[in-house]
């Protein structure tokens, strides 16, 4: 049965609405929509005759026009797969999913992000991903002996947690050490200048740059969550082109692209974040980022008929 009315409620999928949820809620209200917050853990599949198969709390009889994904909480492998299954199923039912499950999968996994950037020729640091401690140790010895430091990161992670710099003589993390979890994700350390640590966050919405900032810190990790300061930044053409190419490489509605410039001026993409925070960016940029996100999201609603459930 097709809907015969337009439901103006929009689920924001998150376990913790916080400041970002409040900003999105206000932006939706300004456009005549009502934001409702639903944790993905409260959604489930219900495969019954004459049912679309996906149940969202508060949308048992009619599926929403779209859902705005603001968070996919961590958990066991099975729990995370289940939450992504919900996003995949909603998209198959012609519900607009922003960002969709595939985009989140491509970017939450740093190895796949790096591979896609490499595949599309987007400049990114030399990277190795392996399970073998022997392989990882050999890479570390070779690179550090050549005076190239490494950075080890958790395959899944954000806000700079678990990121470490490896230099010659440093002890190597054991396979099941915290934030390693049996997989070694190694990148060449990009030297932006000792004592002048900085990188850039470029916020991309629908293949255009919405806003950007430079992050400066008293440590080589410049993440705002790690105490970095923010300044508004207007990307030069090369940086803008690289940021847009990175977003295109992972095929995503919106994202935060982290870029670093080395001592010689060369730019590298460090990461692409599919559920980026923008509180720090909003503090230094005049653009209303939540409104721009909501406007883009709304523009993608109604592309096709939505399937509705039968009570």
Language-model regions, residue ranges each:
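Conserved N-proximal alpha/beta basic substrate-recognition cap immediately N-terminal to
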Residues: 15-126
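Phosphate-binding site of ATP-dependent enzymes
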Residues: 148, 159-247
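Structural motif
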Residues: 68-70, 151, 185
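Rossmann-like NAD(P)H-binding beta-loop-alpha module
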Residues: 120-147
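Glycine-rich phosphate/pyrophosphate-binding beta-alpha loops
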Residues: 273-286
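Protein kinase-like catalytic core scaffold
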Residues: 150, 210-211, 255, 268-271
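A long amphipathic alpha-helix within ATP-dependent nucleotide-binding catalytic cores
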Residues: 188, 220-269, 280, 290-311
């Amino acid at each position: 049965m097709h809907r015969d009315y337009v439901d103006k409620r929009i689920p924001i999928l998150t376990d913790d609405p916080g400041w970002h949820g409040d900003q999105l809620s206000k932006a939706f209200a300004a456009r005549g929509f009502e934001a409702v917050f639903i944790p993905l853990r409260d959604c489930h599949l219900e495969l019954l005759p004459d049912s679309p198969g996906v149940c969202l709390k508060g949308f048992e009889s009619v599926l929403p026009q779209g859902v705005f994904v603001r968070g996919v909480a961590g958990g066991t492998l099975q729990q995370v797969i289940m939450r992504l299954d919900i996003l995949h199923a909603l998209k198959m039912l012609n519900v607009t999913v922003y960002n969709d499950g595939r985009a989140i999968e491509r970017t939450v996994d740093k190895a796949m992000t790096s591979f896609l950037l490499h595949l599309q020729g987007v400049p990114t640091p030399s990277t190795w991903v392996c399970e073998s401690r022997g392989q990882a140790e050999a890479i570390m010895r070779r690179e550090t002996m050549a005076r190239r430091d490494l950075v080890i990161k958790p395959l899944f992670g954000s806000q700079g947690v678990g990121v470490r710099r490896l230099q010659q003589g440093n002890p190597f993390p054991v396979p099941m050490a915290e934030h390693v979890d049996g997989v070694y994700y190694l990148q060449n350390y990009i030297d932006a200048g000792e004592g002048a640590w900085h990188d850039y966050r470029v916020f991309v919405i629908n293949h255009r740059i919405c806003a950007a900032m430079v992050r400066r810190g008293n440590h080589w990790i410049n993440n705002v969550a790690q105490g970095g300061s923010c300044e508004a930044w207007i990307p030069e053409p090369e940086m803008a082109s690289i940021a847009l190419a990175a977003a295109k490489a992972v095929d995503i509605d919106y994202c935060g692209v982290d870029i670093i410039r080395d001592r010689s001026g060369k730019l590298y993409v460090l990461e692409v974040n599919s559920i980026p925070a923008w509180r720090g960016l909003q503090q230094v940029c005049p653009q209303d980022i939540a409104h721009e996100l909501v406007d883009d999201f709304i523009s993608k609603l109604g592309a096709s008929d939505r399937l509705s459930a039968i009570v």
